């Protein structure tokens, strides 16, 4: 992915991520993580502490879509904000609500596309992906544990 290409398409730049911005939001995310959504995760002992990983999840929050940011909060509290991680976000967010998209970029969101994911991996970053996207958002509750590729 060329610099010209990454700068001309919203969500394609890996340069918008801001560790200081992330740190400033940690207390807010912690409250949502612990008290509102009451997130529980496990399996972190299987994540290498040094190497990059590809984390695959599924959306279960309906229109709220807290999954990605809560996962990123969990990542940051375990590994700090300096360990590179990017979350793939639906490219239409930049068209629908550019303000939310810009906030997402500061926390490490990039447009969901093979080229952006590949660029992040080449940089040595880990990547979070939710392959079911909008389909997972609106699936019936009894299918909440199914991941749609």
What name fits each language-model region?
Residues 116-122:
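Short amphipathic alpha-helices and their capping/turn segments at secondary-structure boundaries
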Residues 1-115:
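Membrane-anchoring hydrophobic helices of lipid-metabolizing enzymes
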Residues 106, 122, 130-131:
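Short glycine/serine/threonine-biased micro-segments
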Residues 126-149:
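Membrane-associated lipid acylation/remodeling enzymes share a hydrophobic transmembrane-juxtamembrane segment
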Residues 49-50, 122-124:
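Short, well-ordered loop/turn elements at secondary-structure boundaries
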């Amino acid at each position: 992915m060329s610099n010209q290409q990454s700068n001309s398409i919203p969500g394609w730049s890996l340069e918008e991520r801001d560790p200081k911005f992330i740190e400033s939001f940690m207390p807010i995310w912690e409250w949502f993580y612990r008290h509102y959504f009451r997130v529980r995760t496990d399996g972190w002992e299987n994540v290498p502490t040094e190497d990059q990983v590809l984390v695959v999840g599924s959306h279960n929050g309906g229109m709220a879509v807290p999954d990605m940011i809560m996962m990123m909060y969990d990542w940051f509290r375990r590994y700090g904000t300096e360990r590179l991680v990017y979350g793939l976000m639906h490219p239409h967010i930049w068209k629908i609500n550019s303000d939310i998209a810009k906030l997402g970029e500061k926390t490490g969101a990039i447009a969901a596309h093979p080229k952006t994911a590949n660029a992040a991996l080449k940089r040595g970053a880990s990547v979070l992906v939710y392959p079911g996207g909008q389909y997972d958002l609106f699936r019936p509750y009894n299918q909440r544990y199914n991941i749609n590729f």
